[in-house]
Swiss-Prot record:
Residues 110-137 are annotated as: Disordered. GO terms for cellular component: cytosol. PANTHER family: RIBOSOME-BINDING FACTOR A, CHLOROPLASTIC-RELATED. It comes from Rhodopirellula baltica (strain DSM 10527 / NCIMB 13988 / SH1). Monomer. Binds 30S ribosomal subunits, but not 50S ribosomal subunits or 70S ribosomes. Residues 112-125 have a biased composition (Basic and acidic residues). This is Ribosome-binding factor A. Belongs to the RbfA family.
Length: 137
C-alpha cells in the first residue's frame, strides 16, 4: 500500500477518533484527551492512536482504560467513514512529546537563570574592584 494512502487513512482515523471523543463518547475518563496523531500499519489492520492527557499519571492511566473500553465504538465510526477491507484495530498510547518539551523548557530556563546569576555576581565583583582607590606611591 502506498505511503500516501496510509497517510490519508491515518489522518481520516485521527479526525474520526478526535471528533467522536469530543462529541459522542460519554465516558468521563476520556474528557481531557486530545488526539495527537495516528500511525497505521502497512496492512491497515492496526492503528496506533497517540493521545495527550491533562492530569497526573493516574488520570492518564484512567483515560487510556476509558479509550480502550471505547475502542469498539470508535472502530465502528471508522468503518462507517472509510471504505477499506479491514477496519484497523485501535491501540492507544500517551504521547510524551509535550511532557518532554516542557521538561526541556524548564531545564533551559534554569540554565538561563544560573547564567544570569553568574553574570550578576561577576558584575558586582568587577564594580567592587573598580571602586577601590589605587595609590600611586
Amino acid at each position: 500500500m502506498s505511503s500516501r494512502r496510509l497517510l490519508k487513512a491515518a489522518e481520516a482515523i485521527r479526525e474520526v477518533v478526535a471528533n467522536a471523543i469530543v462529541t459522542e463518547v460519554r465516558d468521563p475518563r476520556v474528557r481531557d484527551v486530545t488526539v495527537i496523531g495516528v500511525e497505521v500499519s502497512p496492512d491497515m489492520r492496526e492503528a496506533k492512536v497517540k493521545v495527550s492527557v491533562m492530569g497526573d499519571e493516574t488520570q492518564k492511566n484512567l483515560s487510556l482504560r476509558g479509550l480502550q473500553n471505547s475502542a469498539g465504538f470508535l472502530q465502528s465510526k471508522i468503518a462507517n467513514r472509510m471504505d477499506t477491507r479491514y477496519t484497523p484495530k485501535l491501540r492507544f498510547e500517551v504521547d510524551r512529546g509535550q511532557e518532554n518539551a516542557m521538561t526541556v523548557s524548564e531545564i533551559l530556563a534554569r540554565i538561563q537563570q544560573e547564567k544570569e546569576g553568574a553574570t550578576d555576581d561577576r558584575d558586582q565583583n568587577d564594580s567592587g574592584e573598580d571602586a577601590t582607590p589605587h595609590s600611586n606611591d
